């Protein structure tokens, strides 16, 4: 004769387990909304407006400092694009503690990789090149030589705009040339385009309109 299996009484354990699972998932997911991604360095963004009635230093203004990826994008998306600035204005991004001037202790023995743009490039290349420059800096894109980087400057000028990465020691050939090669590659410049590195001392004492290049890539 067939036997009837005894009915099993349902356990009350599964629902709490489901609740725990849900709570656990929430605990894992939620912190992503609050955790910011730290940068290796703290950076300061400066703005320069050429008001001839004021001293050079009075025209230089600190906009903000940041040390996370999210705070960088919040700042970048809030300010005017370089291509919309009035001629005579600059943006500078430097490591916190370094001022965007040749006389700063970290800059005075250094120099810059200089990108010179023609008037037509303000519309086509300026903003793209400047953003890529910023990302190179905050992303520490120059490998072991990123410590040699002090900052970068974009000069908006009627005759043609300029972008430059500043390094701390112009005599450090290995660091300077590596930074130049990586920078040129990141900007997507073709091999036939040559960019030059000039020391700040040479730029400050130049007799003509151009400064001699210490290095080229």
From Swiss-Prot:
<dbReference type="InterPro" id="IPR019770">
    <property type="entry name" value="TIF_eIF_4E_CS"/>
</dbReference>
<feature type="binding site">
    <location>
        <begin position="56"/>
        <end position="57"/>
    </location>
    <ligand>
        <name>mRNA</name>
    </ligand>
</feature>
<dbReference type="GO" id="GO:0019827">
    <property type="term" value="P:stem cell population maintenance"/>
</dbReference>
<dbReference type="GO" id="GO:0045931">
    <property type="term" value="P:positive regulation of mitotic cell cycle"/>
</dbReference>
<comment type="similarity">
    <text>Belongs to the eukaryotic initiation factor 4E family.</text>
</comment>
<keyword id="KW-0963">Cytoplasm</keyword>
<feature type="binding site">
    <location>
        <begin position="102"/>
        <end position="103"/>
    </location>
    <ligand>
        <name>mRNA</name>
    </ligand>
</feature>
<dbReference type="GO" id="GO:0005737">
    <property type="term" value="C:cytoplasm"/>
</dbReference>
<protein>
    <recommendedName>
        <fullName>Eukaryotic translation initiation factor 4E</fullName>
    </recommendedName>
</protein>
<dbReference type="GO" id="GO:0051168">
    <property type="term" value="P:nuclear export"/>
</dbReference>
<feature type="region of interest" description="EIF4EBP1/2/3 binding">
    <location>
        <begin position="37"/>
        <end position="40"/>
    </location>
</feature>
<dbReference type="GO" id="GO:0006406">
    <property type="term" value="P:mRNA export from nucleus"/>
</dbReference>
<keyword id="KW-0648">Protein biosynthesis</keyword>
<keyword id="KW-0810">Translation regulation</keyword>
<feature type="compositionally biased region" description="Low complexity">
    <location>
        <begin position="1"/>
        <end position="11"/>
    </location>
</feature>
<dbReference type="GO" id="GO:0140297">
    <property type="term" value="F:DNA-binding transcription factor binding"/>
</dbReference>
<dbReference type="InterPro" id="IPR001040">
    <property type="entry name" value="TIF_eIF_4E"/>
</dbReference>
<feature type="binding site">
    <location>
        <begin position="205"/>
        <end position="207"/>
    </location>
    <ligand>
        <name>mRNA</name>
    </ligand>
</feature>
<dbReference type="GO" id="GO:0001662">
    <property type="term" value="P:behavioral fear response"/>
</dbReference>
<dbReference type="GO" id="GO:0045665">
    <property type="term" value="P:negative regulation of neuron differentiation"/>
</dbReference>
<dbReference type="GO" id="GO:0003743">
    <property type="term" value="F:translation initiation factor activity"/>
</dbReference>
<keyword id="KW-0694">RNA-binding</keyword>
<dbReference type="GO" id="GO:0030182">
    <property type="term" value="P:neuron differentiation"/>
</dbReference>
<dbReference type="GO" id="GO:0010494">
    <property type="term" value="C:cytoplasmic stress granule"/>
</dbReference>
<dbReference type="GO" id="GO:0048471">
    <property type="term" value="C:perinuclear region of cytoplasm"/>
</dbReference>
<feature type="region of interest" description="EIF4EBP1/2/3 binding">
    <location>
        <begin position="73"/>
        <end position="77"/>
    </location>
</feature>
<dbReference type="GO" id="GO:0000932">
    <property type="term" value="C:P-body"/>
</dbReference>
<feature type="modified residue" description="N-acetylalanine">
    <location>
        <position position="2"/>
    </location>
</feature>
<dbReference type="GO" id="GO:0071549">
    <property type="term" value="P:cellular response to dexamethasone stimulus"/>
</dbReference>
<dbReference type="GO" id="GO:0019899">
    <property type="term" value="F:enzyme binding"/>
</dbReference>
<dbReference type="Pfam" id="PF01652">
    <property type="entry name" value="IF4E"/>
</dbReference>
<dbReference type="GO" id="GO:0098794">
    <property type="term" value="C:postsynapse"/>
</dbReference>
<feature type="modified residue" description="Phosphoserine; by PKC and MKNK2">
    <location>
        <position position="209"/>
    </location>
</feature>
<comment type="subunit">
    <text>eIF4F is a multi-subunit complex, the composition of which varies with external and internal environmental conditions. It is composed of at least EIF4A, EIF4E and EIF4G1/EIF4G3. EIF4E is also known to interact with other partners. Interacts with EIF4ENIF1/4E-T; promotes recruitment to P-bodies and import into the nucleus.</text>
</comment>
<dbReference type="GO" id="GO:0031370">
    <property type="term" value="F:eukaryotic initiation factor 4G binding"/>
</dbReference>
<keyword id="KW-0539">Nucleus</keyword>
<dbReference type="GO" id="GO:0000082">
    <property type="term" value="P:G1/S transition of mitotic cell cycle"/>
</dbReference>
<dbReference type="GO" id="GO:0016442">
    <property type="term" value="C:RISC complex"/>
</dbReference>
<dbReference type="GO" id="GO:0017148">
    <property type="term" value="P:negative regulation of translation"/>
</dbReference>
<comment type="subunit">
    <text>(Microbial infection) Interacts with murine norovirus viral genome-linked protein; this interaction plays a role in translation of viral proteins.</text>
</comment>
<dbReference type="GO" id="GO:0006413">
    <property type="term" value="P:translational initiation"/>
</dbReference>
<keyword id="KW-0396">Initiation factor</keyword>
């Amino acid at each position: 004769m067939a036997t009837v299996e005894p009915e099993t009484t349902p356990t009350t354990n599964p629902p709490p387990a489901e609740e725990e699972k849900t709570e656990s998932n929430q605990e894992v997911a939620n912190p992503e909304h609050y955790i910011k991604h730290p940068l290796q360095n703290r950076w300061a963004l400066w703005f320069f407006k050429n008001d001839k009635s004021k001293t050079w230093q009075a025209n230089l203004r600190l906009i903000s400092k940041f040390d996370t990826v999210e705070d960088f994008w919040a700042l970048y998306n809030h300010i005017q694009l370089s291509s919309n600035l009035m001629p005579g204005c600059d943006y500078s991004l430097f490591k916190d503690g370094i001022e965007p001037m040749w006389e700063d202790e970290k800059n005075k023995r250094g120099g810059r990789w200089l990108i010179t743009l023609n008037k037509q490039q303000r519309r086509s290349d300026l903003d793209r090149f400047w953003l890529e420059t910023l990302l190179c800096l905050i992303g520490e894109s120059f490998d072991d030589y990123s410590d040699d980087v002090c900052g970068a400057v974009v000069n908006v000028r009627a005759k043609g705009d300029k972008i430059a990465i500043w390094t701390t020691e112009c005599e450090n050939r290995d660091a300077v040339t590596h930074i130049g090669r990586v920078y040129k590659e990141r900007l997507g410049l073709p091999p036939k385009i040559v960019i030059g590195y000039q020391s700040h001392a040479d730029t400050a004492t130049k007799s003509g309109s151009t400064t001699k290049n210490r290095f080229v890539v």
